[in-house]
């Protein structure tokens, strides 16, 4: 059994090494310009950030550089992921390689941009001014950067949902009917995921969950275009979902 898995493990190791190497090279480049990146990151907050420990400046530079390196490396990471998956697919299924890499990278960047320009400015302003009549907000640079990177990367990953739906529908694993049948269960999972990948505050979780619900709806439309379910199968999925609900109650 191990001998059968060995080629796959070797291939996985190869793809991971390329991905990690790409991130490392990008990290070294980003670290050289970390101050410029920090100014870009801090642009959404008009207050003053403070340093609480001697090594905090170094930690901030490392966090910012590493997060920027991940964003820059996403096309290579998606390419390596595809090269690992592709050998197990049929020839017609391999035709999704360009959409997978292009839209995967694009949706990640779109999610990060949505977080940076729309979500993060509102959240940081709200949280920083909440209770401002009672106490002054002295936010450390390290906590600010951690909050920022977690939100940005979280939204980047979350926006991959339509890409995943396209890929799974293309290979025939899901249909629009199967996604619609389990919509209410998906809502619960979405809020759980939002609680995991966002900072631990309700505002961030709601701002993450609402776009995810919209992306789930978009995924249904994508699945309908790529792999629509026959009418009979759609009714079967709805009946299965209803029976599952009854059994739980």
Swiss-Prot record:
Pfam families tied to this protein: TatC
Coiled coil: none
Biological processes per GO annotation: intracellular protein transmembrane transport; protein transport by the Tat complex
GO molecular function: proton motive force dependent protein transmembrane transporter activity
Matching PROSITE patterns: TATC
Superkingdom of this protein's organism: Bacteria
Keyword Cell division in annotation: no
Protein localization: Cell inner membrane
Membrane spanning residue stretches: 18-38, 69-89, 96-116, 151-171, 187-207, 208-228
GO cellular component assignments: TAT protein transport complex
Membrane topology: Multi-pass membrane protein
Main location, first listed in the record: membrane
Keyword line: Cell inner membrane, Cell membrane, Membrane, Protein transport, Translocation, Transmembrane, Transmembrane helix, Transport
Similarity section: Belongs to the TatC family.
Job description of the protein: Part of the twin-arginine translocation (Tat) system that transports large folded proteins containing a characteristic twin-arginine motif in their signal peptide across membranes. Together with TatB, TatC is part of a receptor directly interacting with Tat signal peptides.
Quaternary structure note: The Tat system comprises two distinct complexes: a TatABC complex, containing multiple copies of TatA, TatB and TatC subunits, and a separate TatA complex, containing only TatA subunits. Substrates initially bind to the TatABC complex, which probably triggers association of the separate TatA complex to form the active translocon.
UniProt name for this protein: Sec-independent protein translocase protein TatC
Organism name: Helicobacter pylori (strain J99 / ATCC 700824)
UniProt gene name: tatC
């Amino acid at each position: 059994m191990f001998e059968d898995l060995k080629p796959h493990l070797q291939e996985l190791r190869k793809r991971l090494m390329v991905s990690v190497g790409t991130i490392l090279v990008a990290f070294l480049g980003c670290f050289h310009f970390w101050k410029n990146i920090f100014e870009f990151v801090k642009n959404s907050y008009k207050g003053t950030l403070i340093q609480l420990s001697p090594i905090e400046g170094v930690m901030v530079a490392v966090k910012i550089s590493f997060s920027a390196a991940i964003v820059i490396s996403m096309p290579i990471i998606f390419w390596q992921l595809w090269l690992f998956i592709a050998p197990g697919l049929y020839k017609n299924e391999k035709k999704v390689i360009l959409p997978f890499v292009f839209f995967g990278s694009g949706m990640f960047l779109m999610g990060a941009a949505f977080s940076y320009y729309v979500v993060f400015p509102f959240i940081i302003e709200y949280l920083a001014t909440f209770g401002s009549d009672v106490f002054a907000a002295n936010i450390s640079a390290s906590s600010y950067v951690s909050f920022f990177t977690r939100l940005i990367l979280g939204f980047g990953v979350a926006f991959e949902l339509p890409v995943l739906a396209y890929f799974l529908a293309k290979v025939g694993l899901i249909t629009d009917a199967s996604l619609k049948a389990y919509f209410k269960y998906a809502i619960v999972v979405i809020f759980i995921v939002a609680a995991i990948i966002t900072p631990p505050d309700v505002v961030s979780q709601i701002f993450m969950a609402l776009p995810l619900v919209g992306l789930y709806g978009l995924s249904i439309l994508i699945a309908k275009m790529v792999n629509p379910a026959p009418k009979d199968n759609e009714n079967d999925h709805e009946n299965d979902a209803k029976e599952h609900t009854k059994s739980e109650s």
